[in-house]
């Protein structure tokens, strides 16, 4: 079966890059992922940030690690939705990876990574996506 990746769920063992972006070496992935999970588990219950900001932070952090050969963007968007669900959001929010604004927001967050990871533009995209899904839902209700 051509095109099927058989290493799903397994951290990558080779270097990867996308465009001009070179991601961390495979040797650092497991430790960095454990650190991300610990940081999220400490951050989530105590933060005063909006759910959109937390979702954007986790999405960007995950795709920056780029732990898998394929599917990192999809998994990051699933994690962003997991954050929103943890705040009581009832619907998944479709965050389009094909959107130029989405790509731009990831690059902006990369640019400010050393200064504390400014993911506010990405949070706004998630907020707008959420607004669209709720607006669509409400417009289809028969009141």
From Swiss-Prot:
What keywords are assigned to this protein? Answer: Membrane, Transmembrane, Transmembrane helix
Q: Tell me the superkingdom of the source.
A: Eukaryota
Q: Where in the cell is it found?
A: Membrane
GO CC annotation: what is one? membrane
Per the record's keyword annotation, is Membrane included, yes or no? Answer: yes
Q: Which residues form the Fido domain?
A: 1-128
The protein's matches in PROSITE patterns, at most eight in alphabetical order, are given as:
FIDO
| Cysteines paired by S-S bonds | none
Q: How does it sit in the membrane?
A: Single-pass membrane protein
Where are the membrane-spanning stretches?
49-69
This chain belongs to the protein called Fido domain-containing protein DDB_G0283145
């Amino acid at each position: 079966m051509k095109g099927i990746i058989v290493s799903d769920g397994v951290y990558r063992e080779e270097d990867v890059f996308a465009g001009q972006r070179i991601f961390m070496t495979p040797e650092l992935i497991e430790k960095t992922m454990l650190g991300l999970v610990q940081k999220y588990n400490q951050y989530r219950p105590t933060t005063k940030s909006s759910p959109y900001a937390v979702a954007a932070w986790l999405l960007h952090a995950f795709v920056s690690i780029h732990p898998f050969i394929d599917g990192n963007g999809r998994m990051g968007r699933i994690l962003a939705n997991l954050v929103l669900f943890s705040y009581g959001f009832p619907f998944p929010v479709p965050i389009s990876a094909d959107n130029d604004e989405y790509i731009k927001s990831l690059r902006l967050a990369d640019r400010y990574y050393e200064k504390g990871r400014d993911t506010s533009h990405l949070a706004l995209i998630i907020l707008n996506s959420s607004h669209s899904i709720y607006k669509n839902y409400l417009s289809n209700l028969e009141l």
